[in-house]
Design a protein with these regions (language model features):
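PEST-like low-complexity, intrinsically disordered acidic/proline/serine-rich tracts
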Residues: 2-319
Length: 319
């Protein structure tokens, strides 16, 4: 209790990365793309992206730090808390940009008292609790407003959505389909058209997702009603009503525009984040864990990538 953590880094090696193009969109020219499909429905096929701060916090908020703290040199005083070592190391990258919010009505999320306490605790510990950091599938609606593009491929009876983060995907069934045998991260989506609005009921969640990085969450009882309404050929109004009687006192709604990516070479680039989270998830099972030991108030961390003696590939690579 009351330790001020310093991290002693012994050495580090940074490896090279490789990204692969998954899909390429048609030309960004609006004139070359029909506004409607052959069956007369709005044409949502293409690459889209939300441009807002909902990924960090659905509610209105000022810009702030990563707000993960630990006791300082005066552990009995809350005002003397200091940034936790992992957040401090990230600098401004751990900050949260300000936002006017996307929650409709009074802007409040109607938590039950015990759920509100859990949300607060989540927010204070997002650096090791947020499912995004573990590269878990982001779930719906979070996948819709992460700061990465996603692709819609539309047909008469199915709508496919592919997301950049974690190679997530889902199918919106416009035809009759049986429910899934198990609950999942991305849920089960069944859609219908009401005029030009696509309405999607999403159920069968496993309750392991968050709604944003601020710690807003839901349970496996979550039910969503999404509405996709065209504003222009290149913008969609996205609304989702969120209902979860185990967490919230009433249904509530968020809304935002989604924008079509118009670059001629717009495409999804693979983001295989699981390989970036392996140490975070499984580092404790290393034969020699990176968190080596405590020396008083100093945590000794070794992030050296050990090379076995006589490794021929490494010797060849270093030539």
């Amino acid at each position: 209790m009351g330790k001020t953590i310093a991290i002693a880094v012994l050495s580090a090696v940074v490896g090279a990365g490789l990204t692969l193009a998954l899909t390429r969109s048609p030309s960004g020219s609006t004139s070359s793309r029909p506004a409607r499909t052959a069956d007369g429905k709005p044409n949502f096929s293409g690459i889209w992206q939300a441009i807002n701060e909902a990924h960090w916090d659905l509610q209105a908020h000022e810009a702030r730090s990563g707000i993960v703290t630990q006791p300082g040199v005066y552990p009995s005083y809350e005002f003397a808390r200091v940034p936790a070592a992992p957040v401090l190391a990230l600098g401004a990258a751990a900050g949260v940009p300000g936002s006017i919010g996307v929650v409709e009505g009074d802007g409040q999320i109607p938590y039950k008292p015990e759920a509100a306490a859990m949300k607060k605790e989540n927010g204070e510990h997002w650096i090791d609790r947020d499912p995004e950091l573990k590269c878990y599938l982001p779930g719906i609606p979070r996948a819709m407003y992460m700061p990465y593009p996603f692709q819609i491929v539309q047909s008469a009876n199915k709508i496919q959505m592919a997301y950049t983060f974690a190679n997530a995907a889902r199918t919106i069934h416009l035809d009759k389909v049986e429910g899934p045998p198990d609950d999942t991260y991305m849920g089960h989506s069944v859609g219908r058209w009401e005029g030009d609005t696509l309405i999607v009921d999403v159920t069968s969640f496993n309750g392991k997702n968050w709604l944003d990085r601020a710690g807003n969450f839901h349970s496996a009882a979550l039910k969503l009603v999404e509405r996709y309404t065209p504003i222009t050929p290149d913008a969609i109004r996205y609304e989702v009503t969120i209902e979860d009687p185990e967490v919230f006192t009433r249904p509530w709604t968020i809304s935002m525009p989604l924008y079509r990516r118009l670059e001629p070479n717009a495409q999804l680039i693979e983001y295989p984040c699981i390989e970036f989270a392996e140490e975070f998830l499984y580092g404790h099972v290393r034969k020699q864990p990176l968190v080596r030991r405590w020396e008083g108030e100093t945590m000794i961390v070794d992030i050296t990538r050990k090379v076995p003696p006589g490794d021929k590939f490494y010797d060849w690579y270093r030539r």
